[in-house]
């Protein structure tokens, strides 16, 4: 099937038409080629749970900020509870796949791989998460889930242990589903006005980038790079993102939340010969440095927003998982490197699992 025949979005069609000559196959950063850490014998008491029920309904979910003002910074406890319940099966899939892939890449037990494939295959055959009846929270769940699944899948697909070699038919079913989800994600998040482009768009672009590499789709890769550039050019001279500053007391937390997808996209682009580090005068570096400074002293964020910053998320080590790709891109030294080492290992299911294993495998694990 040709590239143009596969495309069902005007945004992707334009990129395909003007994308230029043929390219080499897309690849992930080097760490994704790592093999199984140490083959274990026996079942290790691993038990494959039944796959969560595939979510095929309308992607209409309540927002945890329901009833908040335009800053969208005040949590609605009742709405969050309803959101968690209605999305429980999706989140169970995301976390379960990430965990099982991590276990398999550590121990190499076939049951761990078989269970992962069974879960993903069940959802793929049900055409789960593909509803076009969605609200903002619904399309957000779609791209978060896709990034989680594709991010984990990359560790299986590119590992030199070749775990998928004996499962090619099932892998094809799953990857075709990923591609359809990515195409819908492109439709969901394309052509937004600049004032509406924020961390959600960056996370959408990460999910599309991960899927692009998993399925070798240059059109998806180009879309993710394009969205990255929009995000990078939103970073101002002081390292602030105006649309995240709007989050008032949670502005610093949302700047930190914007970094993981941007850093991952830049890292994947770099692996494919596209250097995004200098975009908008090193915007990604500026953004990261601003967040690290703000985590130590949030006064600049308070001055910019007029609000004392909510620091709860900034005290959670895993929220800094972006440091792994970011430090590879910008060669961290000194205090930043020490802070990274102090917080390792970084495990983020929305980024596909154990990023320290991928980017800094020689780091001493503290767990």
UniProtKB/Swiss-Prot annotation:
Keywords from the named record: Lyase, Periplasm, Signal
InterPro entries the record matches: Alginate_lyase, Alginate_lyase_dom, Chondroitin_lyas
Top-level EC class: lyase
Superkingdom to which the source organism belongs: Bacteria
Keyword Secreted: no
Gene Ontology BP, a term: alginic acid catabolic process
EC number of this enzyme: 4.2.2.3
One Pfam family it belongs to: Alginate_lyase
Protein name per UniProt: Alginate lyase
CDD domains in the cross-refs: AlgLyase
HAMAP family: Alginate_lyase
GO molecular function terms listed in the Swiss-Prot or TrEMBL record: poly(beta-D-mannuronate) lyase activity
Role summary: Catalyzes the depolymerization of alginate by cleaving the beta-1,4 glycosidic bond between two adjacent sugar residues via a beta-elimination mechanism. May serve to degrade mislocalized alginate that is trapped in the periplasmic space.
Family: Belongs to the polysaccharide lyase 5 family.
UniProt cross-references to NCBIfam families, sorted A to Z: PRK00325.1-2, PRK00325.1-5
Protein species of origin: Pseudomonas putida (strain GB-1)
Taxonomic lineage of the native organism: Bacteria, Pseudomonadati, Pseudomonadota, Gammaproteobacteria, Pseudomonadales
Subcellular location(s) of the protein: Periplasm
Main localization of the protein described in the UniProt heading: periplasm
SUPFAM superfamilies listed in its UniProt record: Chondroitin AC/alginate lyase (SSF48230)
Residues that coordinate or bind substrate: 63-64, 136-137, 254
Catalytic activity line of the entry: Eliminative cleavage of alginate to give oligosaccharides with 4-deoxy-alpha-L-erythro-hex-4-enuronosyl groups at their non-reducing ends and beta-D-mannuronate at their reducing end
């Amino acid at each position: 099937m040709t590239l143009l025949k596969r495309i069902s979005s005007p945004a992707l069609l334009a990129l395909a038409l003007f994308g230029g000559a043929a390219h080499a196959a897309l690849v992930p950063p080097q760490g994704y080629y790592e093999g199984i850490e140490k083959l274990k014998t026996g079942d290790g008491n691993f038990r494959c749970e039944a796959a969560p029920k595939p979510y095929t309904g309308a992607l209409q979910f309540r927002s945890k900020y329901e009833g908040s003002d335009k800053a969208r910074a005040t949590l609605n406890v009742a709405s969050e509870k309803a959101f968690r319940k209605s999305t429980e099966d999706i989140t169970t899939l995301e976390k379960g796949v990430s965990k099982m892939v991590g276990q398999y890449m550590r121990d190499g037990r076939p049951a761990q791989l078989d269970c992962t494939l069974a879960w993903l295959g069940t959802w793929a055959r049900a055409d789960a998460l593909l509803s076009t009846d969605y609200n903002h929270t619904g399309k957000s769940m779609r791209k978060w889930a896709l990034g989680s699944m594709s991010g984990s899948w990359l560790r299986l697909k590119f590992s030199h242990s070749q775990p998928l070699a004996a499962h090619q038919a099932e892998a094809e079913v799953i990857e075709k589903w990923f591609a359809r989800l990515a195409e819908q994600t492109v439709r969901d998040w394309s052509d937004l006005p600049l004032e509406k482009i924020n961390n959600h768009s960056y996370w959408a672009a990460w999910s599309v980038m991960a899927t692009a590499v998993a399925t070798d789709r240059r059109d998806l890769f180009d879309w993710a790079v394009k969205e990255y550039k929009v995000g990078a050019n939103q970073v101002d001279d002081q390292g602030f993102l105006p649309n995240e500053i709007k989050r008032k007391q949670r502005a610093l937390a949302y700047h930190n939340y914007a970094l993981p997808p941007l850093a991952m996209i830049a890292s994947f682009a770099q692996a494919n010969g596209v250097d995004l580090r200098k975009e908008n005068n090193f915007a990604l570096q500026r953004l990261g440095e601003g967040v690290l400074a703000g985590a130590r002293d949030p006064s600049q964020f308070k001055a910019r927003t007029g609000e004392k910053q909510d620091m709860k998320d900034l005290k959670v080590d895993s929220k800094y998982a972006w440091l792994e790709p970011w430090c590879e891109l910008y060669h961290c030294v000194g205090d930043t490197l020490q802070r990274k080492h102090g917080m390792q290992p970084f495990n983020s299911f929305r980024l596909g699992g154990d990023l320290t294993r991928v980017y800094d495998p020689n780091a001493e694990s503290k767990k």
